[in-house]
Amino acid sequence: MFVKKGDKVRVIAGKDKGVEALVVTALPKVNKVVVEGVNIVKKHQKPNNEHPQGAIVEKEAPIHVSNVQVLDKNGVAGRVGYKFVDGKKVRYNKKSGEVLD
């Protein structure tokens, strides 16, 4: 998967289109990512030690990786490619040519 935890991404589809934020978690088995402050859902929490009455908690839900684009250091969004630099495989932005790793 081309997106890693800690990458800065731009959401390109969905209700949060245009938002730029960091990836909190990458879920490669299901091709999804959790992005900070994006796709907020309300979860009904049963009573427990933390919430004795129960609660409605807002949390970030995963979005499909095809709905985000990785940003480089200059803020240019583009597709991600792979190439070898000094015998090491690195990710790069295909639009700007800048190495991401």
UniProtKB/Swiss-Prot annotation:
Q: Which cysteines are joined by disulfide bonds?
A: none
Cite the SUPFAM superfamilies for this sequence: Translation proteins SH3-like domain
Q: Which GO terms describe its cellular component?
A: ribonucleoprotein complex; ribosome
The record's annotation in Pfam families points to:
KOW, ribosomal_L24
Please name the InterPro entries in this protein's record: KOW, Rib_uL2_dom2, Ribosomal_uL24, Ribosomal_uL24_CS, Ribosomal_uL24_KOW, Translation_prot_SH3-like_sf
Q: Entry's PROSITE patterns? A: RIBOSOMAL_L24
Record's Gene3D superfamilies?
Answer: 2.30.30.30
GO molecular function per UniProt = rRNA binding; structural constituent of ribosome
Top-rank lineage group of the source organism: Bacteria
**Keyword annotations for this protein?**
Ribonucleoprotein, Ribosomal protein, RNA-binding, rRNA-binding
The record's listing under CDD domains reads:
KOW_RPL26 (cd06089)
Family annotation (NCBIfam families): rplX_bact (TIGR01079)
Subunit comment for this entry? Part of the 50S ribosomal subunit.
Q: Which family does it belong to?
A: Belongs to the universal ribosomal protein uL24 family.
Designated name of the protein: Large ribosomal subunit protein uL24
* Organism field: Streptococcus gordonii (strain Challis / ATCC 35105 / BCRC 15272 / CH1 / DL1 / V288)
